[in-house]
C-alpha cells in the first residue's frame, strides 16, 4: 500500500501515525530550541517525548535498535488507538502547561500533539482497527527483520 492509498483509506490511526511523525520532528526541534529559556523543564520533557514517540510510531526501530526488555514492554503498551490517544493527551497537556511559565514555541508542539491525540481518539471511537503505515515499518515489515 502506497502512502497515497493509506491516506485514502480514511483510517484515523494512519492520520494519527503520520501526525505523530510530525510530532517527533517538532518536539525534537522545539525541545532543543527552548533548552536555554525559562521553560527549560518543559523543553527537556518535549525533547524526551520525541524519543518515546519515535519508538511508538516507527515499530521497525524496536527491532534494529538495542533496547532493554523493560523499555520494549513499555513501548508495546501503546498498540491500541485508545492507549496512543492517552499518551498523546498526556504529552500535550504537559506542553500546554508550559504556557503557565510564559509563551514559547512549545505551543506548536502542544497543538500538534493534541491533533494526533484527536486522530487516535477518533479511530477508537469509530471502532477502526489500528493500522500502522507500511512506510514506517508497520504491517509485517518489522516482523520480516530477524
UniProtKB/Swiss-Prot annotation:
One of its GO terms (biological process) is vesicle-mediated transport. Glycans are attached at residue 11. It comes from the Eukaryota. InterPro entries: TVP18/Ca-channel_flower. GO terms for cellular component: Golgi membrane. It holds the Pfam family Cg6151-P. Keywords: Glycoprotein, Golgi apparatus, Membrane, Transmembrane, Transmembrane helix. It is found in: Golgi apparatus membrane. The chain crosses the membrane at residues 13-35, 39-61, 82-101, 106-125. Belongs to the TVP18 family. Golgi membrane protein involved in vesicular trafficking. This is Golgi apparatus membrane protein TVP18. It comes from Ajellomyces capsulatus (strain NAm1 / WU24) (Darling's disease fungus). The lineage of its organism: Eukaryota, Fungi, Dikarya, Ascomycota, Pezizomycotina.
Amino acid at each position: 500500500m502506497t502512502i497515497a492509498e493509506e491516506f485514502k483509506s480514511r483510517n484515523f490511526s494512519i492520520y494519527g501515525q503520520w501526525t505523530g511523525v510530525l510530532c517527533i520532528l517538532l518536539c525534537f526541534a522545539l525541545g532543543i530550541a527552548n533548552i536555554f529559556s525559562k521553560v527549560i523543564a518543559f523543553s527537556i520533557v518535549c525533547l524526551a517525548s520525541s524519543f518515546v514517540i519515535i519508538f511508538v510510531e516507527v515499530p521497525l526501530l524496536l527491532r534494529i535498535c538495542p533496547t532493554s526488555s523493560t523499555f520494549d514492554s513499555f513501548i508495546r503498551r501503546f498498540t491500541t488507538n485508545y492507549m496512543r490517544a492517552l499518551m498523546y493527551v498526556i504529552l500535550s497537556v504537559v506542553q500546554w502547561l508550559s504556557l503557565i511559565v510564559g509563551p514559547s514555541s512549545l505551543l506548536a508542539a502542544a497543538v500538534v500533539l493534541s491533533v494526533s491525540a484527536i486522530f487516535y481518539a477518533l479511530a477508537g471511537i469509530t471502532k477502526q482497527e489500528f493500522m500502522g503505515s507500511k512506510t514506517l515499518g508497520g504491517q509485517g515489515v518489522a516482523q520480516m527483520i530477524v
